[in-house]
């Protein structure tokens, strides 16, 4: 029986704003995390991810490359981002030309165990637990299901007001 090649995890080449709190163990590399944000244990955030100010990334979340998260967002336990849309009917198998970006606006809350495919989500959105977001979300509201659908619209808020 062969021995496995062991690779280290931890924090490598990550950039942090002021007052960022990280609970280890984590796997953060090549990412940027904004001021006053929190990263829970067992989180992986990959290179070139940008996370805004005052965000919470809860335990066991997976944030892959090409993801941008706005300010005042919550990524709940076990949420997962996917950049491979299986455009050719199967996985990209590392072919980065097939990967697509994901963008979350400000004041977005992603529920536990939700899966976010390559989409854009506008400001002031709540994605329910276990939802699968397959298409762009262009209207503030609460979305849930597989595929995620609008359950309820959210009224516009003034700048700086938190709806989450």
Q: Where is each model-derived feature located?
A:
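Flexible, glycine/small-residue-enriched loop-and-beta-strand segment within the central core
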Residues: 2-15, 21-33, 37-121, 147, ...
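Acidic, glycine-centered active-site loop in nucleotide-sugar glycosyltransferases
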Residues: 139, 144-147
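Short coil/turn connectors at secondary-structure junctions
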Residues: 105, 138-139
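C-terminal/domain-terminus segments
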Residues: 124-133, 142
